[in-house]
Amino acid sequence: MSETTELLARLVEIDSINPELVPGGAGEAEIAAFAAGWMGERGLDARVEEVAPGRANAIATARGSGGGRSLLLCAHMDIVGVEGMDAPFEPRIEDGRMHGRGSFDMKGGLAAVMAAAAAVAAAGLRGDVIVAAVCDEEYESIGAERVAAELTADAAIVTEPTGLDVCVAHKGFVWLDIETAGVAAHGSRPDLGVDAIAAMGEVLVGLSGLAAQLAGSRPHPLLGTGSVHASLIEGGQELSSYPERCLLRLERRTVPGETLADVEAQIAAIAPGAAVRSTFERAPFEVAADAAIVSAVHRHAIDVLGREPATVGHAAWMDAALLSAAGIPTVVFGPAGAGAHAVEEWVDLDSVERCAQVLEAVAREWCA
């Protein structure tokens, strides 16, 4: 078993369930301490930074001699829940795949980052190679927010799983609440009651129309179109009462070029008379396909893989958007596998090794 595979197995063994997703989840304190210790033992200047109680980032730097470009390698440590899984923290290797919670999303990418940084720690580079192992990507990304606010670099690579293709764009999202108001009354008094749930039905009809409109809009070349769906609905107290309120929570997935203001205007248009409020937003991400860091990853991927990687977009949101918004040219490149958030999750071990090799090669060139 290679050192990178041994490292990945140890990472999978550590419970790092995001406590915002699963009450009582372990959080990232233990895995951050392990990651910082592992990298510190291999010559990096490593530390743990608490972001919130029980929530931590591990930051490590292979310091250069000065005068070179810096490179930030970023991967998240938190994982989703394990309900229905059998032995989720006991990594199992079969047919070149490692099974276990987080193996694919995204401890495989984390292991690749750590291995690559360790490989260049004593390489005599001029520029810094910085590792940011971050918390909370699966919820609000408070870890990457901290990194974006406090660190900078000349480029960044996020190692979310891409199947060893080069990802240059991903979607964003907006969460919104819509609330309709009624008048509470006994179910026998239609002359007094106003049905807030029925009013929301009209909003849902409008939502279906908006979804169809978005599906027919001009697609982004890598991401397709934006979308919208109803996520949660609540209203009413009992069968024999007119409901005085109904709350709909929805998600609007966005593509580059769509803004929060655009989304809020669209939702307000289908919900006249209702209260509309955006509760959380993450912008989409896009980097030019000919950006220097994209070209470097593409070139070294060809050398390592013996094939030309595809240039792709990703439907899900990633921490890349936060780094890009902070002014750091960012690209996404990571291992292959399947089962993110699923009962059966695995990562291809050869792809983890090759990802680490590409990252190392990019760092040696970029930070020379």
What is each stretch, according to the model?
Residues M1-R101, A122-L125, W366:
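Acidic/His- and Gly-rich active-site-bordering loop/insert found
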Residues E3, G40-L44, G67, A122-R126, ...:
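Short glycine/proline-enriched coil/turn segments at helix->beta-strand junctions
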Residues V168, W175-A368:
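Metal-dependent amide/peptide-bond hydrolase catalytic core
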Residues C74-A75, A132-V134, I157-E160, E179-A181, ...:
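Short beta-strand segments
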Residues M106-W175, C367-A368:
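Acidic/histidine-rich catalytic neighborhood of metal-dependent amide-processing enzymes
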Residues R97-A112, H186, D319:
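Glycine/serine-rich anion-binding loops at beta->alpha junctions
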